[in-house]
UniProtKB/Swiss-Prot annotation:
Keyword Cell membrane: yes
Protein name, as recorded: NADH-quinone oxidoreductase subunit B
Coiled coil segments of this chain: none
Highest taxon of the lineage: Bacteria
Topology class, membrane: Peripheral membrane protein
Any single GO BP term: aerobic respiration
UniProt remark on cofactor binding: Binds 1 [4Fe-4S] cluster.
Reactions performed catalytically: a quinone + NADH + 5 H(+)(in) = a quinol + NAD(+) + 4 H(+)(out)
Enzyme class (EC, first level): translocase
Organism of this sequence: Blochmanniella pennsylvanica (strain BPEN)
Amino acid sequence: MKYTLTTARTDNSEDEQYPLQEKKIVTDPLEKNIQRNVFFGKLSAFLHKIVNWGRGNSLWPYNFGLSCCYVEMTTAFTAIHDVARFGSEVLRASPRQADFMVIAGTPFLKMVPVIQRLYDQMLEPKWVISMGACANSGGMYDIYSVVQGVDKFLPVDLYIPGCPPRPEAYIQGLLLLKKSINEERRPLSWVLGDQGIYRKNMESERQRKRNTRIAETVLSSPDDELNIYSKQNGEA
């Protein structure tokens, strides 16, 4: 199993932008501990599993939105979708109380320093979700005032495609983030300086579903899907 080790860089100039991190491919660090000492290695793996379970099932989002994707994100908090099922219904007004930030909308150039400051105010462990085509790559706004992707100035953990993505896509993104958190390796105690975070290299949904989509031969029209949706919701 391969992991990505993220280390902080200390030689950055003050005018350098995000991401201020370097990445390299390494093996799971817990495997070495198990080889050295079976008991403490297994105990460390069990503790990581318990801590990651708690983190993944109590993800509090920061209440922050930029554009129309934010409307779809907040729709996931309504009764019909009920994001509370996944422990992520507690919107926080302060970044210091949030676990992850969703960049939902168009990241304009003048908003970059604001977003960076809010991200810096979040406590570790923290994650970033890029939601929508504009946040992922600038979308249709290939102009001077729009940053062509959040990953130009923030380390992004998850990308949600769509323009805008449906609330179901946001919920699926939460589930994928929880799956990624369950495979993380972080220090279990207080650490000063570099934390040495290990993240598993997750396979993208596009790659995972590629063969299934290619093999599909019967495609439904948008009108058929709309009729099915209307019947499920009791509409005429």
